Regions:
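Residue-level signature of mid-helix packing/kink "hotspots" within the transmembrane helices
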Residues: 46, 73-81, 141, 175-176, ...
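C-terminal ends and interior cores of transmembrane alpha-helices
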Residues: 101-122
Length: 340
């Protein structure tokens, strides 16, 4: 059943004179694929935050909507942990686009609770919204793991910090587009679906338009991404760049079982736990601001939805310079010692 996710077999290595040009071409192609693909996930991740101010006008209370909002975060955390082990044993070229398409389809269905139930059946609408937003979060959890897999196979340890920092800007690019998409998606396409009923235009801008774009992004990502260098007839990145991490062995190129991943490399990795705990507090601040920013800006500051959308855009883009500097420092100053 899951054979379509299996990593592709290693091909016979190309002639030596073709390896350098092929490697350079594939590396940029693959990097572009995971950058665009990961940005696509953020086009269909936190859209519900943009919808909250409009949903409140339909009679939904913020306490109820906060439950729906939290389902996304819970599902995302669980999925990154569980689906990450599946990703480690899957073809990144298939796994990433599949997750993005499923997230986009789930996002499209988010119009259903308002369209078919509305405030008249508020409890049912909240339950359906919560389930759908849980699915959006779950499928979004399929985005980071294949990108991490691709990055470690195509970029060596001493360049990985810089490349990771550039790639990590993808989530800021994708997240920044949510606000403008909500505004212009409603403006351009809202009347196609709802005629003169402008109160529902936000459903198209917030859910349907970004989801349609994300599906197109998934197709582009599939065309660009390749799983490993060996599947393209190339040597490992360590051999190609003569850049071996400490304690490197050819055995590290093997596909591990879920048991080996969890019990040898996750549960007993103290540094991983330190980073996870620290990151949890960072995300409390980050998403505490991000999730409620559109509502706060509209209700407390008097912003209209267009102004709130562009403020959302600015918040995400402001993170890009710091991300790039940190990645460069981890390579050039700390020599690949990310934990430092």
């Amino acid at each position: 059943m899951w054979n379509f996710l299996a990593p592709p077999a290693h091909k016979q290595e190309l002639p030596a004179e073709k390896i350098d040009s092929a490697y350079k071409s594939y590396r940029w192609q693959v990097f572009l694929g995971i950058f665009i693909g990961y940005a696509g996930f953020y086009i269909v991740r936190k859209n519900f935050s943009m919808a909250i101010p409009e949903l409140a006008q339909f009679g939904f209370e913020k306490g109820e909507l906060s439950i729906v909002l939290s389902m996304n975060a819970v599902a995302y955390a669980l999925s990154k942990f569980l689906m990450g082990s599946v990703s480690d044993r899957s073809n990144a070229r298939v796994f990433l686009p599949l997750g993005l398409v499923l997230a986009a389809v789930s996002m499209m269905f988010m119009i259903g609770p308002v369209q078919f139930f509305g405030p008249e059946q508020k409890s049912l609408a909240i339950i359906v919204m919560a389930v759908l937003n849980f699915l959006v979060g779950w499928f979004n959890g399929m985005g980071w793991p294949p990108c991490g897999r691709v990055m470690t196979h195509w970029f060596s340890v001493t360049e990985r910090g810089t490349m990771m920092s550039i790639w990590n800007c993808a989530h800021n690019v994708g997240g920044a587009l949510v606000g403008p998409m909500a505004v212009y998606g409603a403006l351009w396409f809202g009347s196609w679906f709802y005629g003169a009923d402008a109160s529902r235009y936000f459903l198209i801008g917030t859910y349907v338009f970004p989801a349609a774009v994300a599906i197109l992004v998934a197709l582009v990502a599939y065309c660009l991404i390749r799983d490993t260098p060996q599947s393209c007839g190339l040597p490992t990145i360590e051999k190609y760049r003569n850049d071996y991490p400490k304690n490197y062995s050819e055995k590290q190129e093997e596909v591990l079982t879920a048991k080996e991943i969890f019990f040898k490399h996750v549960f007993n990795n103290k540094m991983l736990w330190y980073i996870a705990i620290a990151n949890a507090f960072v995300y409390m601040v980050r998403y505490g601001c991000l999730d409620w920013a559109p509502t706060f800006l509209k209700e407390a500051q008097g912003y209209d939805i267009k102004q709130a959308g562009w403020a959302y855009f600015a918040y995400e883009f402001a993170a890009i310079p710091g991300t790039l500097v940190c990645g460069w420092l981890s390579d050039k100053v700390f020599k690949g010692g990310r934990a430092m």
